[in-house]
C-alpha cells in the first residue's frame, strides 16, 4: 500500500514537472488572490514574499491524550529566493516539555503562476530531553521536497516527499539507535473563494530503527486530515489565518484520531 502511494506521488511529480513549459499559455487565468502557505500537516512550496514574515502556531491533541504544539517563524532572506525559519515544539507523550528545535533553510527553485518547487534542509538540535523521551539527544538532519500545483481556478494541490535521519539517537535508558524516517503526503484544497478553503490532506511515514545487535524495526503511519481554513485580511497588510482539522488514522494507524488547530499571523516588516 505505502509503496504504491510512493510510486503514485513520484508519477504525479514527473507529470507536473513536464507540464511546466505550457503554463505560460494560461498564466493570466490563474493569477488571482488566494490563500497560500497555510497548510496544516502538508508543506506548501511557497516561500515568503520579500519583506513579509509569518508566525505559525499549531496544536494537535490525539485520542490517547498525547499532544503537540509547534511555533514556527518564517523570514525571507531577504527576498523570496531564500528563506530561514525555526520550529519550536512542545509535546506531551506521558511527560511534557520542549522537543528538538528545527532550523530550516528553504530555496525557492521554481515559482510560477501555477507551479512551485522549494526544497528544504533542516537541522534538528537536541534541545528536548532524551531522558524523558522528548528528544533524540543528538543532532538530526531532514530533507523535504515540496511541490505545489494549481490544478484549476478552484483546486490547489500539494505534494511532499522527505527523509529525516538521526544517527546515534538516545533512548530514555541510555541505549543508542539510528533512526531514519521517510515521509510522504499530498493534499487537495478546494478554493471556495479567496478567503475560505476546504482542505483534504493525506500524510504518512515509514520509520526504520536500527539498534546494535538487533534487526531493524520498521513501523508505518498513515493519516487523512480533512479541515477548513479562513483568511482575515487587513489594510495594513496583516493576514490572520485560523484553521481546524480532524486527523484520522487509516491502515496501520487505524483507531487513532484527534483534533488539529492552526493559527497564522503574516505581516510586512520592511519594504523590499
Language-model region placement:
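Transmembrane beta-barrel domains of Gram-negative outer membranes and organellar outer membranes
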Residues: 25-272
